[in-house]
Amino acid sequence: SLSHEKFFSLGSGPGRALAGREELYKELGYKDSADAAVLVLESDKVPPQEVVEKVARDTGVKAENLTFILTPTRSLAGTVQIVARVLEVALHKIHTLHFPLEHVVDGMASAPLPPPAPDFLIGMGRTNDAILFGGHAHIFVKGSDEAAAKLAKELPSSASRDYGRPFAEVFKAVNM
């Protein structure tokens, strides 16, 4: 996430990989470099100069070569870009289950598109509920039948202890 004073946004896109701030990039041994970067921000506000400068430092890209795409969570664009990450969500869970990512051969996924929301929390709830309760991911893996069967049992969101609770409720409980 990016924040400064009253500005807060979740970010995604190639700029995130360039910054490499998340532990996942270290675990995967992934490093990227580029002269320009794009970040999709879940915000309806242009980031302040302090945030732009931080992103420039973190990515190693000059501020004038950064592009920020604003997609408020409560907008149609925000809804689409969040729900489109259903395969990313599945791969993230595969990683947290310690299934070797190099054994994932292919994948495809889809989720229903909920209507835009009147505010951030409702938008977060609708989009994540669409992924968790309406999303379908088809993951093709190599390896033993036992490992594939274990993954098939543990991967679905229905295996979560929070399954059935609306995401907005879980989000509010964790962030309040």
From Swiss-Prot:
What is the first-listed, main subcellular location in coarse terms? Answer: cytoplasm
Classification via InterPro entries: METHMP_CycHdrlase (IPR003209)
Q: Which GO terms describe its biological process?
A: formaldehyde catabolic process; one-carbon metabolic process
What Enzyme Commission number(s) appear in the record? 3.5.4.27
- What's the superkingdom here? Bacteria
Its organism's taxonomic lineage begins at: Bacteria, Pseudomonadati, Pseudomonadota, Betaproteobacteria, Nitrosomonadales
> What does this protein do, in the record's words?
Catalyzes the hydrolysis of methenyl-H(4)MPT(+) to 5-formyl-H(4)MPT.
Q: What does the record give as its pathway?
A: One-carbon metabolism; formaldehyde degradation; formate from formaldehyde (H(4)MPT route): step 3/5
Report the GO molecular function annotations.
Answer: methenyltetrahydromethanopterin cyclohydrolase activity
Query: Which family does this protein fall into?
Result: Belongs to the MCH family.
> What GO cellular component entries does it have?
cytoplasm
Q: Which reaction does it catalyse?
A: 5,10-methenyl-5,6,7,8-tetrahydromethanopterin + H2O = N(5)-formyl-5,6,7,8-tetrahydromethanopterin + H(+)
Which Pfam families does the entry link to?
MCH
Give the keywords, sorted. Cytoplasm, Hydrolase, One-carbon metabolism
Q: Which Gene3D superfamilies match?
A: Methenyltetrahydromethanopterin Cyclohydrolase, Chain A, domain 2
- Where found, per UniProt? Cytoplasm
Name this polypeptide is given: Methenyltetrahydromethanopterin cyclohydrolase
Membrane-spanning residues? none
